[in-house]
């Protein structure tokens, strides 16, 4: 009876919601700390959604646990259209394989509104420590080390990509885990390991201690047009992997709310000014409605099942 009553209430209230929504500020839950690229991009979208709706985004950053803390908070929120979640691929596709006792269901606990943007990863070396200009040269160099290969990683995505490369190249290597991306990049500059997969934005600025050999996406980036994909670089069986972000809401949000927000978010994602803004972070627009986001989530989840098995990652 309670479920039936809730459904009847939503049906009765939906016309009013459609007419008045949003009538007050909207809370947006983020997975990162304030001031970093994902947070700044979120605020960019928020300002334009405020212009379109007349109501501001109030951002609540809840970093930690690869996005699980934020995802749990969003999933537990009241589905009234006033709590949103800038949902990352890690929380929506990867964590189910990486974490024991996940405190939310990435499929059942959310309503998917729209895709927003994506971030790519690149294969990078310190040329002063690893004298390779191509992936083929890197493979030859690492094989010459006879089992003494090391790589650095900060996130599960970086670890998965590194293990895929080693597997396809027929090389064994030891990982070095870091607590922050900044720390990992500092250690790369110091020549503490042989290679890493890192955020593409680190490849935008020339640096004598950093050389990009390939990009882990399905096609070349317009920001790094001379950098080949892993497939083009000789790893024909490499699966692409990138970080995507979408707008999600708690399960049970009225359809009229989604129908109002989806075209607004999609319009922002397709603007030329958005593409230009995202270039600053080596990010790309990733427009699409909730159906497109669901398909992307399913595909990424399938790929993560492969990566976790390949990298022999045990859920923690």
Regions found by a protein language model. Give the residues of each.
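Sec-dependent signal peptide recognition
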Residues: 1-9
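An extracytoplasmic/periplasmic, membrane-proximal ligand-sensing/linker region
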Residues: 23-25, 45, 167-168, 255-316
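Short secondary-structure boundary segments
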Residues: 88-89, 127, 199-201, 217, ...
């Amino acid at each position: 009876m309670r479920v039936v009553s809730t459904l009847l209430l939503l049906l009765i209230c939906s016309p009013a919601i459609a007419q008045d929504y949003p009538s007050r500020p909207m809370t947006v839950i983020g997975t990162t700390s304030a001031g970093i690229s994902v947070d700044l991009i979120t605020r960019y979208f928020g300002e334009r959604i405020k212009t379109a709706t007349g109501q501001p985004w109030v951002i609540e950053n809840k970093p930690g646990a690869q996005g699980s803390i934020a995802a749990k908070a969003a999933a537990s929120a009241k589905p009234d259209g006033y709590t949103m979640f800038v949902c990352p691929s890690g929380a929506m596709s990867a964590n189910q394989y990486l974490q024991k006792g996940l405190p939310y269901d990435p499929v059942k606990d959310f309503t998917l509104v729209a895709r927003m943007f994506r971030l790519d990863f690149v294969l990078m070396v310190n040329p002063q420590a690893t004298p390779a200009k191509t992936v083929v040269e890197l493979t030859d160099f690492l094989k010459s080390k006879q089992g003494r290969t090391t790589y650095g990683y900060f996130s599960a995505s970086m670890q998965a990509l590194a293990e895929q490369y080693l597997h396809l190249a027929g090389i064994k290597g030891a990982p070095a885990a870091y607590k922050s991306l900044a720390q990992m990049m500092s250690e790369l500059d110091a020549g503490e390991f042989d290679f890493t997969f890192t955020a593409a934005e680190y490849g935008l600025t020339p640096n004598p201690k950093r050389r990009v050999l390939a990009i882990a996406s399905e096609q070349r980036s317009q920001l790094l047009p001379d950098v080949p994909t892993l497939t083009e670089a000789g790893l024909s069986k490499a699966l692409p992997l990138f970080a995507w972000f979408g707008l999600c809401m708690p399960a049970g949000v009225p359809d009229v709310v989604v129908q109002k927000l989806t075209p607004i978010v999609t319009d922002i994602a397709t603007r030329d000014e958005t593409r230009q803004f995202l270039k600053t972070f080596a990010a790309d627009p990733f427009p699409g409605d909730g159906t497109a986001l669901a398909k992307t989530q399913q595909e990424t989840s399938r790929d993560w099942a492969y990566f976790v098995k390949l990298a022999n990652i045990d859920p923690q």
